[in-house]
Structures are given as structure tokens and as C-alpha cells.
Amino acid sequence: MFPPVEIMDTTLRDGEQTSGVSFNAREKLSIARLLLEELHVSRIEIASARVSQGEQQAVRAIAEWAAAKGYADRVEALGFIDGGVSLDWLGTAGCRVVNLLAKGSRKHCEGQLRRTPERHLEDVRAEILAAVDRGMKVNLYLEDWSNGMRRSPDYVYAMLDGLADAPVSRFMCPDTLGVLDPYDTERFCRDLVERYPSLRFDFHAHNDYDLAVANTAAAVRAGFHGVHVTVNGLGERAGNAPLSSAVAVLHDRLGRTTGIDETKINRVSRTVESYTGIRIPANRPIVGASVFTQCAGIHADGDSKNNLYFNELLPERFGRVREYALGKTSGKANVLKNLEALGIDLDEAAMRKVTERVVELSDKKEQVTAEDLPYIIADVLRYDPVDTPVRILNYSLSLAQGMHPVATLRIEIHGCAYERTSAGDGQYDAFMRALRQIYREQLGREFPMLRDYTVSIPPGGRTDAFVQTIITWEMDGREFKTRGLDADQTEAAIKATVKMLNIIEINYTDNGC
């Protein structure tokens, strides 16, 4: 039985080296809490020493929280071989574990430091002992280790020989430039495990050749004890190994345990996405918006017949649900799945007509979503216009320089009219505040959580171009999207919101007005 693989998340240190990404102290503490308390990663790396006063304050806040929770030994920070300057900086911030950065290749040692390997080894040993004297635990990075193993393995062995008896908890082996493939990764890692069976090794992947996850798995297969990841694959250049994919591969393909709570992965990924402003690609495994969406009708049909198109990556594992897209490759099965979710039942002839219309609209490059189905049904079956339970009677939005925007809303819900006025940080925010007041104060009902808000405008630069707003909502643990289209962005958002209201009001018939 293999021991659990240690997952060290370096989103707050290496992930912050992504171009355009910078976390403030509050965001760092929030992410640290999610990683340790919800995801249950083994360790986190939260900062580099000597960056700024603000960074030191962030380290102090996390260190104080971690100490109070009993997590102090699971919070680490990067330090340098600089005669104790980094150690003083981290010690002042309350950090108890330092990840010292040594050179893992002869080229880096001689070319960047202008040191002989022997002198560098002396400096590293002195820094390790200085950290221990300060009561700190030490891990050691061998920067550019992958190129060291490729071009100067004798240098790597000399470093490890000289430090094997030093008080180092883990030797951390980075593929700093992302040059390894899984075959070399496994070969180099196994070499170290066999040469130094008493030492603990971590592998730190970079994704320049899109091999970070494969290399991470190869390192564990070779016997490494821990791996480094980041949420959403953040990191220098092409990024690091994404936590979501690395954990899934270790669990499913290698049969290893990590202690990670998979059901929290999606939530943590979305939180980090909101802090960084870097969108998760829709097709990113595990956490992308489209990865649990079946588009082909044959897949939806197979899922209805003993789950023929399922694999081990079930969406429920990651706190998500399977969806079925509507488009020109959709068959009757996709339409049926969406109608079932809406609680609508059609006969065979009606189903065929609706499916044909969905394909026709998709051929015209029109996007069809589940909330459009009632309107499509009304059109193709010549029903009266859909009797929507929610109608906007009128509203007023005001915007003045130096003042908060104000919205006055009058809305009809199941025949009852309600009116509210509210200020907000923007016109749509004011509209939503007024709407929430109606739901919570007058209806006494919960209101969906707005999870995501995206706006797209066709290329061309015209000020009168149509704006498409897609809003993701969450209610009762279920996420769904609505879409609005208008030349005005706020109007588009309001249209998407009204569609959401008509979806949630299906289950209500009378407000008692």
C-alpha cells in the first residue's frame, strides 16, 4: 500500500508569477483558507521573501491564522541564499518553514551566481544551518534541476551528496524551464530515489510543452513523495501543473491517494479565477465550463441507455452536473434531456419539430440554450405566446456624476405587482438590489446567487453593436445560465435576469396578493 502523495500548492507564490496576476493580502488569506481547510492540500507556498512590505504583511496574516489553526508547519515561503536576509524577513513575518532556493545545474551555478559548485555548496549549508538556528524547518529547491540531470548530473549528485546529512525535510526538484517529457522525468526521478533512498523528494513541473500533468504522474510513479501544483495551472510562461488535473490523474490512473476533497475543486478554481481575472478555458479538464457537456445526440442517447458515454470523471465528483448542449449536432436525446430538466413533456411528433427547429437555428449560428426551449415550443407548435409568470412592468435607471446610480423597478410576479427603489454601485447592481429586496422582503423567498457575468461584443468597434450578456446563477446547489441580447449592456443583463426569474418561478403559482 502506497502512502498518500503530498500535494504542495504554490498558487500564492509561483502562481502569482503569472503575467498580470497580483493578490492582495485579503485574497491571499482567503485562498490559503480554501486550500488548507476545504481542499485539504498537504502544504501551501505563499510568497517569496524580500518582495515588498505588503507581501510581508500578507505572510504575517496567513502565518498568524495558520498558527491559531495548527497549520503553521504546512505554510511555506521561498527564501534565498543571501546570508540570512531572507530568513530575517520571513522570521519577522512569523513563517516557520522556508523553501531555500539553491542551484540545481552547473550552468546556473557558474553562469548566474559566478560561484564554483564547491563554494555554492558551502553557502547552501550555511544558510540551512542559519535557518535551523532560527527555529525554522527547511526544504531545498534545486533550481533548473531538470537541465542539471540532462547536462551535468555529476553536479546534481555532488550537491545531494554534500547535503544528504543536512537538516533538510524535502529536496524539491523543479523542471524550471518545462523541458522534460514523462520518460525522462521518470528516469531522472527514479535515479534519485534509488541513489538516495533515505531522502524525501518533491517534483515541481512547468507546462511549456503541455506535459506538466504527465510529468507529475511520472515523478510519482518513479517514487517521488510529493508534487507541486497551482489552481487553474497558474504560473510562469505556460504555467504549472493544474491541481485539478494532477489530482484526478493521481487518483484514477495511478490509484494513489492525496487527501484532496475533489468536491471542492470547482469552487476553489472559480474563486481564484475571480481574483486573478484570468478566465478558465471552457475546455480545461475538470473545471472548464464545457467539459461535462455532451453535444452529440448519440452521446445523450447512450447516456440514457446505461450511461454508455460516462467515464471515471463523473461531474458529481467535482461538485458539478452533466449538461446536454443544444445545437446542430444535437439529436432528440439532447432536447429530451433539457426538457426533462425543465419539467416539460412532449409527444413524439412535437419532439421531432422542436429538434428540427433547434438544428435550424444552430445552422444560422444562433446560440440555443435550455431557457429558449419554451419559446421554441410555442413557435413551432403554434401555441399562444408562452405565459411567463414574471413580467417587467417598467423600470427607471438614473446615473449622475458623483452619485450612486439608482433603479426603480415595478415587476409583476404571478399577477401581483411589486415596486422597489434602490441605489447601487452601478445601474445593474441597483436594479438587482431592488429585485432582491422584493424577493426577500415581500415574497420571503431566497434569490439565486450570481456566480458569473460575461459580456461579448462582435468585432468591428461599432457603438451600436449588439451586446450579449451571459449570466451564471446558482440556486439549491444547481448552476444554470441565461442570456440577454441588446444594444445596451444593462438592458441585455436585465433581459438575462428576467429569463432567470421565469425559470425559478415555474415551481411557484400564487403569491397570495
Model-derived segments and their meaning:
Residues 12, 48-49, 80-82, 102-105, ...:
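Short, ordered loop/turn segments at secondary-structure junctions
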Residues 2-7, 13-43, 64-70, 83-139, ...:
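Alpha/beta enzyme core
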Residues 4-11, 250, 254-421, 461-468:
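A mid-to-C-terminal "edge-of-domain" accessory segment
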Residues 17-18, 22, 27-31, 36, ...:
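Non-catalytic terminal/interface segments that mediate subunit docking, oligomerization
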Residues 50-70, 75-78, 82-87:
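N-terminal active-site wall of soluble small-molecule enzyme domains
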